[in-house]
Amino acid sequence: TGIQYTLEDYLKGQDGVRQIDMSVDGTITGEYITKEAVAGNNVTLTIDANLQKETEKILKDNIHKLASGKYGEKYDANAGAAIVMNVKTGEILALASYPDYEPELFINGISEKKLAEYNKGKNLYNRAISGTYAPGSTFKMVVATAALETGTITTKTQINDTGLYPRGYHPACWYYTQYHYGHGYLNIKQAIQKSCNYFFYELGYRMGIDPVIEYAKKFGLGNKTGIELSGEEDGIVELKDYCKEVTGVDWQFGDTLSAVIGQSYNSYTPIQMARYISMIANGGKQIDVTLIKAITDSEGNQISKEKIEQTVNSKLGIDNSTTVKSLDVKEETLATIRKGMKGVTSEYGGTAYYIFSDFGMDIAGKTGSAETGQDNKVNGWFTGFAPYDDPEIAVVVLIENAGSGGNTAPTAKEIMQAYFGMNAKKVTEDVTAIPSTQTAR
């Protein structure tokens, strides 16, 4: 399964042939090798074994904390994914999906009871690459990029959040729903920091949905990353086409209002989100998502990247459409977005400030809370990168039914602490101090 399946041709080697001559009475008269055995190739993965182990444990533990009420309120959290990616190379340092499974149980035949248990919990389903989810407010950086690059706004443009948005179906910012007044005048950096829905509703009104879709695609959303694992999904980025296909009705302004805060038909995998955040962190540079550091033959010769790609693409049926080009955007655009993401974690009013205010390092992040359409359940996202000034890693965490993105942030914090070798200060009681979180924040 997994990477072993993809790289089977490189790993298995070739059997040798030994010929044995025998006399009529069964006596061996000669023995020699007619074909030498060829050892399999050596595959070095990008995965950091210690970080992988820690990431799996941190994800599992925090899901259980949410489900048990350790953070103050019980949620139906029962599944999720977490990814750590090198923002400069696209190398995967850790990739976890929960619930997971024990591969060794399949070697001698898994019991029907255990298999039924796995099927019920979708343990064999890799949520990091196969799960597609509405991104919630983590999508706002796409909308911000589109607005700045199309000239819809500048970095100095201010929009007054009065609470209830006056157009369309009159949606309210989460802040108004919670506190009964708006954020007031905000610029784009502040709108990202405070995750102001009203601000982004207005951007949707001013520029429409087409530029948003265009820049979502430029960030690689809705498009497979080409990671060397089977089962990767595309997601949904062609929002207007999909709307027409499933409803038979053309796209409406109300759909735009929902889409710009990461709802509507937006649907992306955690691995796509990790690539997207990495591109924000590295200044928009193209990266190739990969699990393979190197493959060498039995004599120590390194196999070319091109040859490996051809083999993997053929095995998994991948074409070159997974390649995302470097973003052709103004330097100021991504710099402004990064500042907004820094404010999320380091400035009062930032939606993850209560979690990261004591982190000891400047980082950037964005929370996201996305309605699932099922019994008022909300998935939680945290996407971010660190360090802020010279980014090394992007961390993406998705927890199903977490209640909010704020509830997902502690998982990302602990993963970052594990990567940087910090003495992880478990965030438990402190999380109860976070204001209750509304949808799409």
Where are these regions (language model features)?
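Small/polar-residue-rich segments within soluble enzyme cores
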Residues: T1-G40, K57, A274, S346
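Short strand->helix junction
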Residues: Q52, L66, T132, N401-S404
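Beta-lactam-recognizing serine transpeptidase/beta-lactamase-like catalytic domain environment
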Residues: S23-T34, I47, G80, V87-S137, ...
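Short amphipathic alpha-helical signal-transduction/dimerization elements
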Residues: A281, K413-A424
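Short, charged, low-complexity patches
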Residues: D48, Q52, M273, S404-K413
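Conserved helix-loop functional segments at active or binding sites
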Residues: D61-G69, Y98, G343, G421
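Short, highly charged C-terminal tails/helix-capping segments
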Residues: T428-R441
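Conserved, well-ordered alpha-helix/loop/beta-strand core segments that scaffold catalytic motifs
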Residues: I28-G80
